[in-house]
Amino acid sequence: MSETKRVRVRYAPSPTGFLHIGNARTALFNYLFARHNDGDFIIRIEDTDAKRNVADGEESQMKNLKWLGMDWDEGVDVPGKYGPYRQSERQSIYEPLIQQLLDEGLAYKCYCTEEELEAEREKQKANNEMPRYSGKCRHLTKEQQAEKEAQGFKPSIRFKVPANETITFNDMVKDDVSFESNGIGDFVIAKKDGIPTYNFAVAVDDHLMEISHVLRGDDHISNTPKQILIYNAFGWEPPTFGHMTLIVNESRRKLSKRDGSIIQFIEQYRDLGYLPEALFNFIAMLGWSPEGEEEIFSKEEFIKMFDPKRLSKSPALFDNVKLTWVNNQYVKKLPLNDVVELSLPHLQKAGVVSADLDQAELDWVHKLVSLYHEQMSYGAEIVPLSEMFFADAEAITFDEEEKAVLAEDTVPTVISAFKKELEALEVLEAAEVKAAIKRVQKETGVKGKGLFMPIRIVTTGEMHGPELPLAIEVLGREKVLNRMDTWLKNN
């Protein structure tokens, strides 16, 4: 490929599912590469496998790409001169090219049934041979083909893979990669219904759309020699290929959609209240790293820095802890009003806050969220973080460590004195609560952990949490007094 050729890259999803982490990373790296080089980022929908297409799959993919912060220069919703941008609308482009290969003797009709092909594969496996098509129909005469069709057989079209060739390409990530043509076998380029297969349609589309670089996952690397053979058959120049290493879980296994230990779909992160900028940041570091130790960057900084030479040759580890840390860095920078907006739907969904808030309730939610602003990693996390504010006194239970603290002889005296102090307060505000705790210290002679821990455990139900006077203010007089009453009655 010429060095001066305009950079044009594509993300080409199939609408057979929703946008997951792996595909989002592919889209993101192509987006960054295009923007870094002032090139074009194209969205092409590869929807030829109609049986597997999911309703709203295409719309959902594009909605979530936009939510992550990506825009594109051409696509189904951004017309350009290289359209149509859905493969299902490009059949009239593929058909004459398939016919051209047939006419030139570079492809042939195959009448083998699925049963015959399966039997062939099983026989090869039994002989410890690599399963590949034997070429059974490669030399059928026109008369034999006509006889098959007269019998009602519909042909698929297979590409004639040349024998004894080494197919080599320089990969942006893996450097020089080679495949032997003898290990490939004649592959199908058009199915029996005339619809082109993935490898044929992709090669044709990438050429006609003038795609300069194909940056995709490592799981596509075995497709590359087939696509290069198609390029060569037409006398076209292949794009530059780059195959990113796969994303693995903590067990170093490839991410699987069935792996429940990791949330994999962007829509789910969106629903949980993750921030798009944070997810963009996290995904951009999955298998790519800048110079230095810094890990938090803006989209503009990523665009400026992105260099495919810094793509890792080792699998990218999906680290849940790192993801929550990254999102927390972004949440901490948000104004409190934005964090409340992020949190409120989750509190309402949990049924702990009413759907139709009045101003007093909204003010209370602001106070509640402010206690966890620095700690929160995503919107939905406010629910488990703040559950102590909604528990009934009778439902509060204590673990063994908390029970040990509450078993000290001075605890009933401390709790009784603190209850008396709060009952005397006209306004339950943090400053007044703090002063009340000091008076309890003076009255009882108990100080330090012996004073604070019992008060915290009885009033909040937890040994650790937000600053105690603030937590008690947000809990409110009625709830705090009720919890102390309940504990004193039971002890």
Swiss-Prot record:
Positions with a binding annotation for Zn(2+): 110, 112, 137, 139
Major localization class: cytoplasm
UniProt keyword Cell membrane present: no
Cofactor note text: Binds 1 zinc ion per subunit.
Catalytic function, reaction form: tRNA(Glu) + L-glutamate + ATP = L-glutamyl-tRNA(Glu) + AMP + diphosphate
Cofactors demanded by this protein: Zn(2+)
EC number: 6.1.1.17
Entry-linked InterPro entries: aa-tRNA-synth_I_cd-bd (IPR045462), aa-tRNA-synth_I_codon-bd_sub2 (IPR020751), aa-tRNA-synth_I_CS (IPR001412), aa_tRNA-synth_I_cd-bd_sf (IPR008925), Glu-tRNA-ligase_bac/mito (IPR004527), Glu/Gln-tRNA-synth (IPR000924), Glu/Gln-tRNA-synth_Ib_cat-dom (IPR020058), GluQ/Sye (IPR049940)
GO biological process: glutamyl-tRNA aminoacylation
Cellular-component GO terms for this entry: cytosol
Annotated compartments: Cytoplasm
Motif ('HIGH' region): 13-23
Keywords: Aminoacyl-tRNA synthetase, ATP-binding, Cytoplasm, Ligase, Metal-binding, Nucleotide-binding, Protein biosynthesis, Zinc
GO MF term list: ATP binding; glutamate-tRNA ligase activity; tRNA binding; zinc ion binding
Motif 'KMSKS' region boundaries: 254-258
Keyword Manganese: no
Binding site for ATP: 257
Quaternary structure note: Monomer.
Family membership noted in the UniProt record: Belongs to the class-I aminoacyl-tRNA synthetase family. Glutamate--tRNA ligase type 1 subfamily.
Function: Catalyzes the attachment of glutamate to tRNA(Glu) in a two-step reaction: glutamate is first activated by ATP to form Glu-AMP and then transferred to the acceptor end of tRNA(Glu).
Protein name (record): Glutamate--tRNA ligase
Gene that encodes it: gltX
